[in-house]
């Protein structure tokens, strides 16, 4: 959401220089960010070129079932469905060709671009009613955004393969999500040309009914929303306990990220300034957790508008 190879053969140094741009961060802890839910004054290229960030989550695939039974996208200011999408009745999909170069730019810098599915319930509908629906969505998203080969003409980003999916289910119902996660992981094995990731963004009250622990334990990392949730918010009395519970509950093989608001301007509850967040991150570091991975910010545009909030956070990671 990472790159971890060391080469010692002298003859490969020139190739390494080309493959690993100077832009790339080398800190052990990572910073992930959501992009696409606000206006696009801060472009995807801006985010990709910002050395603060290691992973970009595209927000959002907001509905699992929309026009023609296909998902609905609500990412940035795209131009509506393509001709082929309209013909198929997939009116919730978007022509994402304007983002293709930016996605490739991010990927060329070693920064995964991940499709986040869900969001707040007044904005999205990612509730499933059966395991079969979960498997269906995993296969549909695999074909439309990842390494699948069916429905090529409907792919929003053409032949570009995104790097994975993020589960942001806030419905308080995890039905079908375990089956969906397992199907995604099975599909990932079909394409050995690249690494795919599956992540989640549960709420901090532990455990989260929307993102059950049996799902979270299958993932690459979990970026817990320590905001909008009262006592377990950052700098609140229940924060440390929630962090420890999540770390233990997801298991040492799944990385834990501390999710935070990059601004208080969006009406969400629980924003803290950069100094307070950095103290909270230092508190987590001192816990010496085996799976602490870094931090997550909501959202890229909000961070820029808040004095480039992300730079202070990355500097502390």
Curated annotation (Swiss-Prot):
Glycosylation: residue positions: 25, 49, 169, 245
Compartment list: Secreted
Signal peptide (residue range): 1-19
Alphabetical list of SUPFAM superfamilies matching this protein: (Trans)glycosidases
One term under GO cellular component: extracellular region
Catalyses which reaction(s): Random endo-hydrolysis of N-acetyl-beta-D-glucosaminide (1->4)-beta-linkages in chitin and chitodextrins
Known EC number: 3.2.1.14
One GO-annotated biological process of the protein: chitin catabolic process
Active-site residue list: 170 (proton donor)
Molecular function as annotated in GO: chitin binding; endochitinase activity
Keywords from the named record: Carbohydrate metabolism, Chitin degradation, Chitin-binding, Glycoprotein, Glycosidase, Hydrolase, Polysaccharide degradation, Secreted, Signal, Virulence
Gene3D superfamilies: Glycosidases
Pfam family name, one: Glyco_hydro_18
Listed PANTHER family: ENDOCHITINASE (PTHR45708:SF49)
Family: Belongs to the glycosyl hydrolase 18 family. Chitinase class III subfamily.
Physiological role: Secreted chitinase involved in the degradation of chitin, a component of the cell walls of fungi and exoskeletal elements of some animals (including worms and arthropods). Participates in the infection process and directly acts in the penetration process of the host cuticle. Involved in heat-shock adaptation.
UniProt-recorded name of the protein: Endochitinase 3
Organism from which the protein derives: Metarhizium robertsii (strain ARSEF 23 / ATCC MYA-3075)
Gene field: chi3
